[in-house]
Amino acid sequence: MTTQAAEVAKRRTFAIISHPDAGKTTITEKLLLMGKAIEVAGTVKSRKSDRHATSDWMEMEKQRGISITTSVMQFPYREHIVNLLDTPGHEDFSEDTYRTLTAVDSALMVLDGGKGVEPRTIALMDVCRLRDTPIVSFINKLDRDIRDPIELLDEIEAVLKIKAAPITWPIGCYKDFKGVYHLSGDYIVVYTPGHGHERTEAKIIQKLDSDEARDHLGDMYERFVEELELVQGACHEFEPEAFLKGEMTPVFFGTALGNFGVDHVLDAVVDWAPRPLPRAANERTVEPTEEKFSGFVFKIQANMDPKHRDRIAFMRICSGKYTQGMKMRHARLGKDVRVGDALTFFSSEREHLEEAYAGDIIGLHNHGTIQIGDTFTEGENLGFTGIPHFAPELFRRVRLKDPLKSKQLRQGLQELAEEGATQVFFPERNNDIVLGAVGVLQFDVVASRLKEEYKVECAYEAINVWSARWIECSDEKKLKEFKDKAYENLAVDGGGHLTYLAPTRVNLSLMEERWPEIKFRATREHH
């Protein structure tokens, strides 16, 4: 095996998906603890350790205790290199989250054992399903009261349309939580409370049919054995092939806060989740073990470093090897650039990088020329596909508090739009600026970042827009005719694409009927 093939085989790149408050930040922290990336897992609200154990680093996130921006953390575990991509976990999330899921090979779904499948989880699973992403599931908060585990598995199957195969099974919960039983390995992992902040070796009891197991379970023993018979009769057995196709999820139980069960999940990612996968480009499919470098940008983040007004483009490497000082072709611009200072990530601790392989995420300094979806290669003209823009669902008109700052406002919005934090539209018929977002919090984020980073204060007004559609038409004459007729509702987005801002659902349906030659698109690929 070549060095490169060996490096690729070691990599696992995954994201965590969950509904707000299911325990995602805690599990992120505990995963980093497993990978020895941090020495002490502090609780998120009061971290004083040098290496912040989490990715909540922007001003507004610090105040709200939610992870708004996707962050990337790399750590070693059992001879492997794990790349963990954090996704926004709050009520309201942006396209950032969707796009992060295009940069991973598998995902870890965290469910709150007391609540089960929640709306945000459903939305994220829909995105994973577009690419048949393999999913590992962790049912969290066993140190509290949870719903009946069989009921939880039924709900995963019914609502998320994926087969659930339990790997471990909980012994009691809340005050009676005794640990988990490994179904195929026939052993118990004993839960001892109070070790949430440190790495400890869990006690193992071999064989359920043993005196030690009977002592540990006490009067719960008979009931547990009966429950297990039911579980083994009713549940799916784990099939690695079905998991890799995105049809089945292995399910683990534990408590992230108690640092219990998290290592089982990480072992599953290393043992079962795929190494970096081939990627589709317009021209051909790119294999991760190819010698020549290629990668695509899935996110742009402004101002990661308050000391430098910089913007970082996050790139997923798809093939080859990044080495310091190498020359890359920026495919969209057809220009060659030399990259000497790519970054690797440990949350906001940024370190310079010597080399990286397929599956790794690196950060490129961006001076305004890189956009989301851009492909970089070692000379070949490639364009990776599948990095979408989604039509926003909410719209506001932007009003400046200080009219003299319109230049800063436009620059700020243009940069934030490139970064994917919002979408910006410039109507053809006036000088309005319209913002579009997937969730309400995005508007707050944009206003607070304009104020913090660009020193521009703005307010929002309601606007009569129901949805946006990108316009495509190969017939120039028809397009001109359409533009003349639909002028009142046309706008150009931040990337210069013609967009139709529909005031109502009915209006959009009528337009689609009236103009069959025009394509009204709800998503567009980044080009």
Swiss-Prot record:
UniProt keyword terms in alphabetical order: Cytoplasm, GTP-binding, Nucleotide-binding, Protein biosynthesis
InterPro entries: EF-G-like_DII, EFG_III/V, G_TR_CS, P-loop_NTPase, PrfC, RF3_C, RF3_dom_3_sf, RF3_GTP-bd
GO-annotated biological processes: regulation of translational termination
Origin superkingdom: Bacteria
The keyword Ion transport appears for this protein: no
Entry keyword annotation includes Repressor: no
Chain residues that bind GTP: 18-25, 86-90, 140-143
Record domain tr-type G: where: 9-277
Gene3D superfamilies found in the cross-reference section: P-loop containing nucleotide triphosphate hydrolases (3.40.50.300), Peptide chain release factor 3, domain III (3.30.70.3280)
Gene Ontology CC, one term: cytosol
Cell location: Cytoplasm
GO MF entry, a single one: GTPase activity
Pfam families cross-referenced by the UniProt entry: EF-G_D2 (PF22042), GTP_EFTU (PF00009), RF3_C (PF16658)
Entry function: Increases the formation of ribosomal termination complexes and stimulates activities of RF-1 and RF-2. It binds guanine nucleotides and has strong preference for UGA stop codons. It may interact directly with the ribosome. The stimulation of RF-1 and RF-2 is significantly reduced by GTP and GDP, but not by GMP.
Family stated for the protein in its record: Belongs to the TRAFAC class translation factor GTPase superfamily. Classic translation factor GTPase family. PrfC subfamily.
Entries under HAMAP family matching the protein: Rel_fac_3
Protein name: Peptide chain release factor 3
Lineage: Bacteria, Pseudomonadati, Pseudomonadota, Gammaproteobacteria, Pseudomonadales
